[in-house]
Amino acid sequence: MSTPTLTDIPAEAEARAAATGSLLRLATAGSVDDGKSTLVGRLLFDSKSVLRDQLAAVEQVSLDRGLTSADLALLTDGLRAEREQGITIDVAYRYFATPRRSFILADCPGHVQYTRNTVTGCSTADVVVLLVDARNGVLEQTRRHLAVAALLRVPHVIVAVNKIDLVDFSAEVYAAIEADIRAVAAELGVAEIHVLPTSALLGDNIVEASTSTPFYEGPTLLGLLESLPTARDEGAFRLPVQLVIRPQGAAPSPELRDYRGYAGRIASGTVRVGDPVVVLPSGRRSRVAGIDLGERSLEEAVEGQSVTVRLTDDVDVARGDTLAAAGDAPQVLTEVDARVSWLSEEPLHPRARVLLKHGAQTVQAIVRAIEGRLDLDDLTTVPADRLELNDIGLVRLRLASPVPLADYSVSRSDGAFLLIDAHEGGTLGAGMVQLAGTGRGEPAAATSSGRG
């Protein structure tokens, strides 16, 4: 399984948007041929986010295919195989901005065998735009994507009932599909959902309001995206340490001789000079002496920024540790229940040995039990003795080393992890910690398990 990379996103623009709180991460999903890539292309085109040379390239490829107009889906179909097959098979990322907001957009695949890519695209999203073909209504893959959005606790879900022009802009068809969507969303516990009729091909209700849907009086898709609130700064401070920075050999200058900093990308919250922090899993405490961003010193840094934090005490901190707000740190656990979206073609069985990766920390783990699987037909949890590709199940894991974790419903950054093949290094599954109401989640023994 390939690891998607974030392309076409100016690093300075992303950092600036993250710092101001104007950045919105969105993902598109839906069944194959629902028009996801066309909708994204229309959104980019109508919001004037397409460069002239990009549009010229799309027009030329469209002409080569024998089309009479530009195929806007090509604006996001970045892989050669996508262009040849006409389907999105990986997550295509795009950065764009309007006067009101900056966006990182992930266009996810629709085929059921690529659900794992959809999990990747939705895992960091503030909003998921789910497309439903007005001719087909709610399908199993629609339910699957809604289940993934609910599982990943995506704060906002927008459902675009697309290709509404192909059912003659029928108010009755739209009303029936909207009712089905809201019923499924309620069963899955989707927190907030918006539904609107669209035609990505013609542009109805994407950027400009449609005159063909008088039965819909709500905002356009872009209007929704520009107005949705984000809660990116409300979580407690977390910084998974990616690198310990300390001069090797002779320091280039006296002031750097005793320099020691802990570099990483802030996963949640805000940190300020003077804040008390705790090092996890050891539990040692200190205060923030300084925050460095390149050659600049900052008084504070926020979620999404990559910084180096210096502490007032020479405590033991290593790659894989987490710096957390001292007054609001997660539990350090060695046993945990989690919802797991299984992404491997090889089934998951009890007693399987895997690696669990959380932030920058990777530990050995064993599957203690598989306690159920989500049935996408009736949205109930049924008994299961294994998880197959694209299954979503409840799994109990025993960890070889303590890991700081929290319930995913409380904190997406503290509650998310990956399961990795210990031999080949491939991603096997995405997990969401489920502690609330289970009575499970075994804390590690007091900090003696940390390094001495």
Which positions does each model-derived feature cover?
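Residue-level signature of catalytic and energy-coupling elements of molecular machines
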Residues: D33, L39, V58, G86, ...
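P-loop NTPase switch module centered on the Walker A-proximal segment
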Residues: P4-Q113, A125
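Alpha-helical scaffold elements adjacent to nucleotide-binding pockets in ATP/GTP-utilizing enzyme cores
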Residues: L39-L43, A57, N117, Q141-V148, ...
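Accessory interdomain/linker segments of ATP-dependent helicases and helicase-like nucleic-acid enzymes
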Residues: L201, P219-A263, V278, R285
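Active-site phosphate-binding and catalytic loops of NTP-dependent enzymes
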Residues: R65-A70, D77-I89, V184-I193, G223-F237, ...
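C-terminal effector/interaction modules appended to NTPase cores
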Residues: S2-L26, D34-S37, T98-P99, Q248-G452
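Canonical P-loop GTPase G-domain recognition
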Residues: P155, V167-A236
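Conserved Switch II/interswitch segment of TRAFAC-class P-loop GTPases
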Residues: R101-F103, C108-Y114, C122-L146, A150-A175
